[in-house]
Amino acid sequence: MNPGEPNRTYYPALDGLRGVAILLVIFLHNFGFTNYFFFGWLGVDLFFVLSGFLITDILLNTSGKKNYLRNFYMRRVLRIFPLYFFTLIFCLFLIPVFNQSLNISYYKENQLWLWTFTQNWLYVFKDPYGSPTLLHFWSLAVEEQFYLIWPFIILLVKKPKRLLWISFLLLVAVMITRVLLWKFQIEDLAYDSLYTFTRIDGICVGSMIALILRIQSQVLVKYKWLIVFILAGLNFIIYFLNLNSASRLPYLAFVGYTTFAVLFGILVYDAVTKNSALIKLLFANKVLIFFGKISFGFYVFHWPVYLLLFPNFRNLLTGNYQMQQGVAQLISAVIVTIISIIISVISLRYFENFFLKLKKRYS
C-alpha cells in the first residue's frame, strides 16, 4: 500500500515509469539544444496515462464508501495545491524582485487563469510562447479539469463495463475533435498540444487500463502484441523517421497522441500484471524509482530553475572560461539539472511529505 492512498497495491514499476516520464521531459527542456530529444514531450503523455490509471483505480476502490468525493478531492488538494501554489507565488512575486531577465508580466496580467487551473485555455487563446516560465503548468491544468468531472461519472455510472465504454467514447471524441480542428484549418500548436479536449487521450487510456483490469477482460492478453506491433511500427515510421518536425504535427493531430497513449497504456498494464525480471530490471530499479518519487517537484521546479540559471552558467563558461558554445551549454544544462534534483529532494522531504502524511486522514 502507498501511504495515504486507500486500498491500492504499490507497484514499484509504476514509480519507475514515472521516473521515465520526468526524465523525458527534462531531456527535452534542459537538453533540447542538442536536438536529440525532440520526443521528450512523450513524458507528459506517459504522466497522463499513469495518472488516469492510478486515479481511476483509487476512485473504483472508494466509490461505495462514505465521503467518497470529499476524501478524493482532499487527497488531490494535499498532493497538488501546496507545491503548485508555492511555486506560483515564488514565480509571480519573488522572482521579479531578484531577477528581471524572465518575462513574468504575461502571467501577472493573466494570473487568474493560473490560480484556477485553467491556464491551458489561456495559452490556447493568447500566445504564451514569449514568456515560457510557467508554460509547463498546462498539463497540471488539464488533469485538474478532468478530475473535476471524472469522480462524479464513476459515482453515477458505477458499473466498470459502462465506464469502460464511456472512456472509449471519450477517447474517440478527442480524436474527432482534433480532426475537426484540422479540417477547419485551426492548425495551431496550442490547440493540438494544450487544449483540454485534444490532450486527454492519455488520461482516458489510463482509465481504460484500470477498468479492463477491474472487469478482468482478456482483450489485451489476446491482442496486445498485435497492437504493439502495429502502433509502434506506425509511430516509428511516421514520427521518428520523419526528419521534418513541422510535418510531424498533422500525424499527432490525427492519431499520433492516441497511438502513443495506447502503447503507454499497454506498458502500464504489463507493469501491474507481470512480475517478470525484465519489468523489474527496466522499471523497478532504484534509479528510476528515485526519479519517480521526486517527479512532481522535479516537474514543477525544473523549468523556472533552468530559465533562471542556464543563461548565467552558459555566459560564465563562454565568457570567463572561453569554452566553446556547445560544451558550455552541455555543462550548464548538467549543473542546472543537478540543482533542480537537489531542490526536488529537499522539497519532497521537508515540504511535500508534510502534506502527504495528512492524506491518511482522508483514506
Language-model features: where?
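Membrane-cytosol interface segments of multi-pass membrane proteins
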Residues: 1-202, 214-229, 273-277, 287-289, ...
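Acidic/histidine-rich catalytic neighborhood
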Residues: 209-211
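Alpha-helical transmembrane segments and terminal signal-anchor/GPI-anchor hydrophobic tails
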Residues: 221-276
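Hydrophobic alpha-helical transmembrane segments in multi-pass integral membrane proteins
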Residues: 236-242, 297-312
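Feature representing long, continuous alpha-helical segments
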Residues: 253, 257, 261, 265-269, ...
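Juxtamembrane membrane-water interface segments of multi-pass membrane proteins
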Residues: 279-281
